[in-house]
Curated annotation (Swiss-Prot):
CDD domains recorded: Radical_SAM
Family in the record: Belongs to the radical SAM superfamily. Biotin synthase family.
A molecular function GO annotation: 4 iron, 4 sulfur cluster binding
Name of protein: Biotin synthase
Length: 309
């Protein structure tokens, strides 16, 4: 597996926009059907009161936001949501809990949720925070397909965004997930005040993992009132597309997922993202606690682009 250098990554990022998107689309076509997209759904199964201080997150207990604390959902309610997602066209169902990391007793309930969702024929992913090694094994034994744990940004910019857990903590969790035999879902957030070099370094970290993540989530910051990043300057849309193209070129076989922030994107920007290598979006009225494009808008966009899902 090729190990990329920063200079190599920066050279690619600095291509003319047309050349960069052309190369990304060429690699995308070699590995994926350019006229298809995977539909995923993401449900918050435990909301709010998270002890971490991630400056972007409305669920952090450190900030006063619109999010209300809600306990871990009942299994029956999760299954109802999963059935609804499948009926709407999702083939992948993700569950997220606002924890620093799960307690073993809570993990048992999550494992039951995973088993029931799997019975519906859906691919499963959960994001529960930091894991211990034995917890990763437990999730694998429950049949979990993917575990999501984002690095969020570059190692150099990380401490400007989060101080309650380290960048290495995140890498350790990814290592436990990989060792258990599960697939890794990992990405980050763009538009938190980081530089293009930080964005390049984030993709470089993902590309140079011992085994690259099978799933790479790219989020655009949703500026939430009450969080420290509510007034940060927006990322330039062309730089956003450049990061996606860079990820496609450096991590050619991974599913690149356009995640949070689509509600604030134009159809034209989303189309450019798909052209640059996105193969999956999160579908439904909400992504965790934040608004997502209505399904009708997504279906209209897919029809305009001739995309099958």
């Amino acid at each position: 597996m090729k190990k990329w250098t920063f200079d190599e990554a920066k050279e690619i990022f600095s291509f003319s926009f047309m050349e960069l998107v052309y190369q990304a689309q060429t690699i995308h076509r070699a590995n994926f059907d350019p006229n298809k997209i995977q539909i995923s759904s993401l449900l918050s199964i435990k909301t709010g009161s998270c002890p971490e201080n991630c400056k972007f997150c409305p669920q952090s207990s450190h900030y006063k936001t619109y999010v209300k604390k809600e306990p871990l959902m009942q299994i029956e309610d999760v299954i109802t949501a999963a059935k609804r997602a499948k009926a709407a066209g999702s083939t992948r169902f993700c569950m997220g809990a606002a924890w620093r990391g799960p307690r073993d007793e809570d993990l048992k309930l999550v494992c039951e949720m995973i088993k029931e969702v799997k019975k519906l024929g859906l691919e499963t992913c959960v994001t529960l925070g930091l894991l211990k090694e034995h917890q990763a094994v437990t999730l694998k034994e429950a049949g979990l397909d993917f575990y999501n744990h984002n690095i969020d940004t570059s190692e150099e910019f990380y401490n400007k965004i989060i101080t309650t857990r380290t960048f290495q903590d995140r890498l350790d969790t990814l290592r436990y997930v990989r060792a258990s035999g599960m697939k890794v879902c990992c990405g980050g957030i763009l538009g938190m005040g980081e530089t293009n070099d930080d964005r390049i370094n984030m993709i470089l970290t993902l590309a140079n993992l011992e085994e690259p993540a099978e799933s790479v989530t790219i989020n655009k910051l949703i500026k939430i009132p009450g969080t420290p990043l509510e007034n940060v300057q927006d990322i330039d849309p062309f730089d956003f597309v450049r990061v996606i193209a860079l990820a496609r070129i450096m991590i050619p076989k991974s599913y690149i997922r356009l995640s949070a922030g689509r509600e604030q994107m134009s159809d034209e920007l989303q189309a450019l993202c798909i052209m640059a290598g996105v193969y999956s979006i999160f579908y439904g009225e909400k992504i965790l606690t934040s608004a997502n494009p209505m399904p009708e808008r997504d279906n209209d966009l897919f029809q305009k682009l001739g995309i099958i899902h």
